[in-house]
């Protein structure tokens, strides 16, 4: 199964072509939130390197959140535009789960964290072993200070913090656990390849592109400010 994977849910962006779990081609950019300029050229690049066109793609995979509201919208809009002409089925994968797949051969507890600002992180905990990833907690937006409590039951296991919020998570938990570390730089960020692997390894459902929806976990800053303004006016 030829898959086009995409990620633009945070600071980095990536695109990948896989044949099942096997990586064929990949592009990765860490240049800030310029995804509207970089994502489609990366798709063209990975397709060209793989000597494929969108007509050859059996399924598209996109990280559907949590993360940057703008980045998520750009990614979902891009994958819909790419998939609709050929009615290619699509699959949305948690950004945090895609991160965990970076560590699937590490035999560890993956503390996946993204900087959600306001002293919070988007986080989920996974157990990685023998190439498999087992979800232990649901994706959530939480204060980083809650992580030691969440991870307490895994205190005797090796814990690796991964994601663009990994340093925040690490600072929150390093004094509570003996065996906690940061992921290597090369595996620090979510990748389109990880999202594609998750979809394949877990036999996720592929749906019509029009049915793809973003997963934000919390209202946007503008929505929160509007809600606060309304409450003050009541």
What is the meaning of each model-derived region?
Residues 1-66, 141:
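N-terminal beta-alpha supersecondary unit
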Residues 22, 89-189, 216, 221, ...:
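Surface "functional belts" at beta-alpha junctions
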Residues 30-38, 69-73, 77, 94, ...:
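Residues at secondary-structure transition points
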Residues 46-50, 85, 103, 192-205:
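Stable alpha-helical structural segments in soluble proteins, enriched in small hydrophobic residues
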Residues 48-55, 83-93, 206-207:
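Phosphate-handling active-site elements
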Residues 61-90, 95:
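DPxDG-like acidic metal-binding loop motif
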Residues 183-234:
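Acyltransferase
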């Amino acid at each position: 199964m030829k898959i086009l994977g995409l990620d633009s849910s945070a600071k980095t962006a990536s695109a990948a072509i896989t044949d099942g779990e096997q990586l064929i081609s990949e592009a990765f950019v860490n240049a800030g939130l310029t995804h509207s300029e970089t994502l489609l050229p990366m798709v063209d690049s990975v397709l060209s390197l793989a000597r494929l066109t969108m007509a050859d793609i059996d399924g598209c995979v996109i990280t559907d959140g949590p993360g940057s509201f703008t980045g998520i919208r750009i990614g979902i809009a891009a994958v819909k535009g790419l998939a609709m002409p050929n009615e290619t089925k699509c699959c949305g994968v948690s950004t945090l789960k895609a991160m965990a797949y970076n560590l699937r051969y590490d035999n560890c507890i993956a503390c996946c964290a993204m900087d959600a600002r306001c002293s919070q992180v988007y986080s989920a905990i996974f157990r990685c072993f023998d190439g498999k990833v087992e979800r232990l907690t649901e994706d959530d937006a939480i204060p980083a200070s809650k992580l030691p409590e969440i991870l307490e039951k895994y205190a005797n296991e090796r814990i690796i913090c991964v994601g663009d919020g990994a340093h925040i998570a690490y600072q929150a938990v390093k004094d509570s656990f003996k065996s906690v570390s940061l992921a290597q730089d090369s595996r620090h960020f979510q990748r389109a390849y990880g999202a594609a692997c998750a979809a394949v390894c877990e036999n996720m459902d592929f749906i019509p592109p029009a049915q793809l929806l973003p997963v934000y976990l919390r209202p946007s800053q503008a929505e929160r400010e509007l809600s606060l303004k309304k409450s003050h006016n009541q």
